[in-house]
């Protein structure tokens, strides 16, 4: 009965609608004997089914990363040329030693690492990508740090490139820097970087981020750590309209059959379960609202928790009104069930192969780009590469401002070239005039900004870090110092 109700909910039909979808109530995996009893006149069909079952091999869906093939300029070399140029011993030494050539693994550990990376066949491709990544990075080093970067900078760059190579991820960085470069070429506003990726000097030199991690002492190990093998996680911010432009560019480059959205599943929370079941059972709206209001307002509230906080709700299960008791009974059963599907706000898959080779997909309402039928918890274990494309209204506002300044003042500004020590900007912070400014707009933050009178970027970094439960109590002493 509960499943019947769920069908009504998903098809938006009433329980007593004669035209609604109905199941035969025969939908379960039957035993061999049950199938023989159902089809006594078709023994050959039973035998054929068993034969097919016996031929099914064991397999796993999980896979190593299925990295899209990034096109490498032919003048750098090809995989075939690399096979002739480098021996397996060369690759063994390059991928199992540290960036200075020191032996850091036992032979057993080294062989395990080679196998984990996909064997020597895969290493030739990784090395080719790593060499191209190094070439692009070194061009970026000159742009970011000049012709003669310090030994500290070069040591950091070489270390990061080595980690990226020996973890098997140079192709990932080539893909990300490529669509970010394309976005900027199309006039899309790209965010300066967020999260642990801001700790990478290579990402900074490639233009993936616009924050110097060496200047601000940001840790690369929070981003990539050989002791914790996982795909890099780079969130990229675009202006709202620009995000769609970049998606279209990526789809054009890699193919519509290799790019998709990621599905999300919306489950039924306690309040919604009561309201939905009541609607299908045709319980009066006033009664449905009364029952729903008896569920406390709290994150991750369940009916089981609600009964403890409000015993009157549990008593409704014994209501003399059968519609009320049934509503609570079925709401208990259906709570947590999948209510509807949606599209992940920012997650995009870019695959090496057609996605249908690895994952079921479905049409996306109002879009040509398809959507996976697996959610984000399952796409990465099976090897598919997830990129986060975020559309930010803040960046859209910045883009509009720059366009308006260009039209009205005939001044062309680049948001990345506005100095971080701009005096007029700091006056806004010292006055607490930060309404609408992310993480600086609460009344408490404004009060502390007026007390601090910040005059350098680092002051704002410190205040942002301190303004949270726990460290917040030290803000007054920080301001005094």
Which residues does each predicted region cover?
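Alpha-helical scaffold/interaction cores of sigma-54-like transcription cofactors
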Residues: 1-481
